Amino acid sequence: MSRVSQARNLGKYFLLIDNMLVVLGFFVVFPLISIRFVDQMGWAAVMVGIALGLRQFIQQGLGIFGGAIADRFGAKPMIVTGMLMRAAGFATMGIAHEPWLLWFSCFLSGLGGTLFDPPRSALVVKLIRPEQRGRFFSLLMMQDSAGAVIGALLGSWLLQYDFRLVCAMGAILFIVCAIFNAWLLPAWKLSTVRTPVREGMRRVISDKRFVTYVLTLAGYYMLAVQVMLMLPIMVNDVAGSPAAVKWMYAIEACLSLTLLYPIARWSEKRFRLEHRLMAGLLIMSLSMIPIGLAGNLQQLFTLICAFYIGSVIAEPARETLSASLTDARARGSYMGFSRLGLAIGGAIGYIGGGWLFDMGKTLAQPELPWMMLGIIGFITFLALGWQFSHKRTPRQYTGARRLI
């Protein structure tokens, strides 16, 4: 086996271990934020939505800067620094008793993500061969689902005792992950050339096709982020107990572990990437509309199942399609900018979703936020259809990236 092949094989295992630590650290804390501050402390959902939206916007909106700096200086220092910063954000969140302190903790967490997320995604592009990336993304997403359930279960158990224990566990996991990267991650360069920060950013911004695609995905992310805000609140309201939230993530894990990889393998040679993305988005949009009318857990979990199935279809295609549009000379910059749709959609989804949820309760119309999200999904579906009908995209891809 050549040294390059050996490095790629070892790199796969490194990426999988690193990803599991990050997923566990994230899902121990974030799914429980809305339960802690809305249900237990009685805050308005919009206040928590602002915090979650701020984290999302900082991490994803500034991702192009983190990616461009990583193109210049390499992945390792950015990843280690970012993970330690997220640990500090979680530690601060544990003592948050005022909205401004929660917002500050989410700001720190998001800034840490800005530093470590783009170079981690660029490492996938560097280490995984183009023909293998679609399947590797499916493995990562299956791992995400399993990690989400384990993290949510652990966080829910710790929440029975003290929310500070939840945040401490999340911080410890990110510190362990920082040590893991500092110890084992080689000083790899991300791009084929050591691209200056400004040059990498210029390459991305001048790529109109990539920019249009990324911005269009904002509508997709408005739906996707509700897994962290409105869906847990809805499950808690219907069930009358925050313990039911873990079953929501268990459903996601079961569907992902059983369907994600087989669907990706079966569809990659039969359907174009854009058709898979649009089909998944359509299912997600249709499942959103009736959620506000669900009167029991059986109805609610059925709709959540449909939503997750749509996500299982769409996510690998979205990742792979994003990868096909990258430039190898500025991988970090592309990976960073590709997060802008998530930054915009996530911020609007969290803040707007929280506001609509509160408004729906005030007006005694709980279906209001879900109807609006369904409409946004349909608009995004049409926008993607128009874009893809004018610009052909490849069935496979050449180049890649990833909500945490």
UniProtKB/Swiss-Prot annotation:
It is found in: Cell inner membrane. GO terms for molecular function: transmembrane transporter activity. InterPro entries: MFS, MFS_dom, MFS_trans_sf, MFS_Transporters, Multidrug-R_MdtH. Residues 1-12, 117-138, 186-213, 265-276, 321-339, 389-404 are cytoplasmic. It holds the Pfam family MFS_1. The keyword Transport applies. The chain crosses the membrane at residues 13-33, 99-116, 139-159, 165-185, 214-234, 244-264, 277-297, 300-320, 340-360, 368-388. GO terms for cellular component: plasma membrane. It is a multi-pass membrane protein. Disulfide bonds: none annotated. Residues 34-98, 160-164, 235-243, 298-299, 361-367 are periplasmic. Keywords: Cell inner membrane, Cell membrane, Membrane, Transmembrane, Transmembrane helix, Transport. Belongs to the major facilitator superfamily. DHA1 family. MdtH (TC 2.A.1.2.21) subfamily. NCBIfam families: PRK11646.1. This is Multidrug resistance protein MdtH. It comes from Salmonella arizonae (strain ATCC BAA-731 / CDC346-86 / RSK2980). The lineage of its organism: Bacteria, Pseudomonadati, Pseudomonadota, Gammaproteobacteria, Enterobacterales. The gene is mdtH.
